Amino acid sequence: VSMRILVTGGNGQLGNELQRILREGRSEIGPIPDAYAGAEIVAADVDELDVTDADAVMAFVAQGGFDLVVNGAAMTNVDGCETAEDAAFRVNAEAPGNLARAAEAVGAKLVQVSTDYVFPGTEPEPRVEDDPTGPVSAYGRTKLAGEERSLAACSRCFVVRTAWLYGYVGKNFVKTMMRLGADRDEVTVVDDQLGNPTSANDLAHEILKIAATENYGVYHCTNEGTCSWADFAEAVMEGAGLDCAVIRCTSEEYAAMNPASAKRPAYSSLRNKRLEDTVGNEMRPWRDALSAYLNNLPEMEG
């Protein structure tokens, strides 16, 4: 019997990659587990399913007969969450709880996608899964609450924290830099926030590997290597062949230019320790993943 998979936020950066990888049976990294052969995927966005409506979620999951639920639905605008924490809490915390209860009721597995922003980012050492959390923003607080609710309500739950995600669809930092780089001679980017740029293709690959096991709990899943946003921007300009200089600034300078911006962790690099210890860490070095992305992007945008 082929597996039935529900992906919420199904047409977002991650949802899109999950759909394609499941169709093709492989990612840019390589083949996915045989358990997914012939899998049926239901990609639900807000039009199909309001994840904040507990009753609707329970009914949708029960009727769908799903084996696996991947929650890619989130309010990810970090600055926007700061001024709308109630709305962010509904989507980032209550909705995962709804999905977790629904998955538990039908015996399905749940993957709750989370973020490096659950950490304070005060220590310049990559975080492992059981390091103490301490979010400094509304986005981080609401996502941490979503992790807690998911793990509490579903016994077959994986929490997968990622960071600085970019995919072939939708808006992301890489596409923004390419757009600005084509128009401008220079762009100003912060140089004192460090983390891991992550390809949605790599993340989707590892999520499918993890979810084929019963090693439940928290995982970190980012591309390998730590850089600043300015380093990331420079790599994009170089890789896309754009003649645009990256001017480096501090978070303080950025905040002065953008007063509504949320506080962000200074150092939120993650170490994929649990992956290393279980299914194996196949996440590519971030520059390799970015090169592949830039090569594939014209064809993907077709």
Segments and roles (model prediction):
Residues 189-194, 219-226, 278:
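Glycine-rich Rossmann NAD(P)(H)-binding loop
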Residues 40-55:
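Rossmann-fold cofactor-recognition segment
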Residues 90, 94-98, 109, 118-160, ...:
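Catalytic helix-loop patch of NAD(P)-dependent Rossmann-fold dehydrogenases
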Residues 206, 213-260, 294, 301-302:
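Mid/C-terminal beta-alpha module of Rossmann-like enzyme folds, strongest
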Residues 148-195, 200-202, 208:
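NAD(P)-dependent short-chain dehydrogenase/reductase
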Residues 263-302:
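C-terminal amphipathic/interface module of NAD(P)-dependent oxidoreductases
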Residues 3-28:
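N-terminal Rossmann NAD(P)H-binding glycine-rich loop of SDR-like oxidoreductase domains
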Residues 51-91, 102:
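NAD(P)H-binding glycine-rich loop region in Rossmannoid oxidoreductase-like domains
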